[in-house]
């Protein structure tokens, strides 16, 4: 009977150790994933900043990703250049306004 208890205790110890190692590995993977997401968040272009060279690199806003909006600028020399900035398109602004108004009403 004593041998059975020792074997059971040994098995329980091994199982708990292996499951804790698995949890540690899972936590490490989650941490790496969060760090990678934070890195991409830092690399995105904030609202109202220039995105001429990277038109798909705008950050996310409250509800939608900002869009790179471009305009043609004419210099005093008559040269036309394209300038772009990250901003919220009008239809996204309208949707955010409706959602904000709905939150105020329905709380």
UniProtKB/Swiss-Prot annotation:
GO terms for cellular component: extracellular region. Expressed by the venom gland. It is found in: Secreted. Residues 21-41 form a propeptide. Keywords: Disulfide bond, Knottin, Secreted, Signal, Toxin. It comes from the Eukaryota. InterPro entries: Spider_toxin_CSTX_knottin, Spider_toxin_CSTX_Knottin_CS. One of its GO terms (molecular function) is toxin activity. Residues 1-20 form the signal peptide. Disulfide bonds join 44-59, 51-68, 58-86, 70-84. The keyword Secreted applies. The presence of a 'disulfide through disulfide knot' structurally defines this protein as a knottin. Belongs to the neurotoxin 19 (CSTX) family. 04 (U1-Lctx) subfamily. This is U1-lycotoxin-Ls1d. It comes from Lycosa singoriensis (Wolf spider).
